A protein has these predicted regions:
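Short, aromatic- and glycine-rich surface loops/edge beta-strands on solvent-exposed regions
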Residues: 32-49
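Short acidic/polar inter-strand loop motif in beta-rich domains
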Residues: 27, 48-55
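Extended low-complexity, serine/threonine- and proline-enriched intrinsically disordered segments
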Residues: 1-5, 10
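Short beta-strand elements
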Residues: 52-68
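Anionic, low-complexity intrinsically disordered segments
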Residues: 7, 43-46, 59
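Aromatic sugar-binding surface patches on proteins
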Residues: 9-35
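Beta-strand/loop edge motif enriched in small/polar residues
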Residues: 31, 65-238
Length: 238
């Protein structure tokens, strides 16, 4: 860890500023520089033993170095491609793939959800980031380079983020890892025109469910093949 000196911007402003030099290199401890690489998680802690009311206060702020940030409330329209060379992608709250739109995610891409964060207060989980799909989601990983959907935390736990919800939209997942969410992959209100396919993937360490399909009319085609579903305490498949 490196230390940064913070200076208040003015008298009683409550705004503190500081800086540290960063370089893309191997870690060297205590050299006054922060060595980083693309996708590294940067976390800043500020602790005040006596805040405004005499009580100890602490502030934590987290960001990803060289990440594509997809902000809470983003709506994806038309055809959109996410790829490893433009990633990782940091989702800070609920994101919607609109009806008629297609989001394609290519092999090796990391999609990271900011833990316990959602300013939209919407979706299935009001206080956690989710990827909601009313259009089409195609996730095409490979055995050598799967697509990862995971938490922003360095020490992640189940329930850090909401999950991937197909709200009457279709979803195809091949060589995908979904971990540390609340409900994993959730098909809601699907019918015969909204297939959900999960192949050669890993669904693990989610708080409640691994893969769910409910509230449809019974005609939806759901295919799960060659997939490891483990440590999803309520149900692996529901």
């Amino acid at each position: 860890a490196e230390e940064v000196v913070l200076t208040e911007s003015g008298v009683d402003t409550g705004i503190f500023e500081g800086s540290i030099e960063m370089e893309e290199a191997a870690v060297v401890k205590g050299d006054g520089k922060l060595q980083v690489g693309s996708g590294d998680l940067l976390t800043v802690f500020y602790e005040d033993p006596q805040g405004d009311f005499g009580d100890e206060e602490s502030v934590r702020s987290t960001a990803l170095y060289s990440a594509s940030v997809v902000r809470a409330g983003t709506s994806i329209l038309g055809s959109t491609l996410w790829s490893q060379d433009k990633g990782p992608y940091l989702i800070t709250g609920d994101v919607m793939v609109n009806e008629g739109a297609t989001l394609t995610i290519l092999e090796g891409t990391r999609v990271i959800f900011l833990a316990n964060s959602d300013s939209t207060l919407g979706g299935n989980e009001r206080y956690d980031a989710e990827l909601n799909v009313k259009g089409s989601l195609s996730v095409v990983g490979s055995e050598e380079a799967p697509v990862e959907f995971t938490s922003s935390e360095q020490s992640p736990v189940a329930g850090d983020w909401g999950g991937i919800k197909l709200e009457g939209g279709s979803g195809s997942f091949t060589h995908v890892v979904v971990e540390y969410s609340i409900y994993g992959i959730y098909g809601s209100g699907l019918d015969g025109s909204d297939p959900m396919t999960v192949e050669s993937s890993v669904i693990r360490h989610n708080r409640d469910y691994g893969i769910t399909n409910r509230d449809g009319n019974g005609t939806a085609k759901v295919v799960i093949k060659g997939t490891e579903i483990v440590d999803n305490p309520k149900y692996g498949i529901y």
